[in-house]
Amino acid sequence: MGQERLDNANPTLFDSKPRHRPVTGTERDESVEDPIDSWEIFDLIRDINDPEHPYTLEQLNVVQEELIKVFIDEEETFVKVNFTPTIPHCSMATLIGLAIRVKLLRSLHPKVKVSVSITPGSHSTEESINRQLADKERVAAAMENQGLMHAVNECLRVPE
């Protein structure tokens, strides 16, 4: 792809977080239930490939642990992920959001509810994109579209 066709030809790169966090005593205790938390969700999505650049969403600071919230009660677990496109007019924002959502749907228990949206104020059409990402029928239809799923799977592909 030629540089003139990129939305953001020179994205800023950020350092990656350490792969391992300190292990607490309760995490070592197999008799204690270890509920999912924001770090685990971040670890699932940090290596998603950007559709436009040869970098991960973490390297581009599109996903950040601080923008992930996990709510757990007796009835359900709810995961909310905000992501921040590198530029306010990023044409790949919907694809990035869909890739995050698909990765979580494939990785988490089906009972876990997932919400993926653009960080408020970070994109010129965030309301429209957030509506699309929240619409279960549109997401299901997108997952049936072979061309779109090829693009999503490329984002989710693990480098060799």
Curated annotation (Swiss-Prot):
InterPro entries under this entry?
A: FSCA_dom_sf, MIP18, MIP18-like
Looking at the record, which segments are called Disordered? 1-32
Sequence similarity: Belongs to the MIP18 family.
rRNA-binding among the record's keywords? Answer: no
Q: Which UniProt keywords apply?
A: Chromosome partition
What protein am I looking at?
MIP18 family protein F45G2.10
Q: Which purpose does this protein serve, as stated in its record?
A: May play a role in chromosome segregation through establishment of sister chromatid cohesion.
Q: Which Pfam families match?
A: FeS_assembly_P (PF01883)
A Gene Ontology cellular-component term:
cytosolic [4Fe-4S] assembly targeting complex
Q: Which GO terms describe its biological process?
A: chromosome segregation; protein maturation
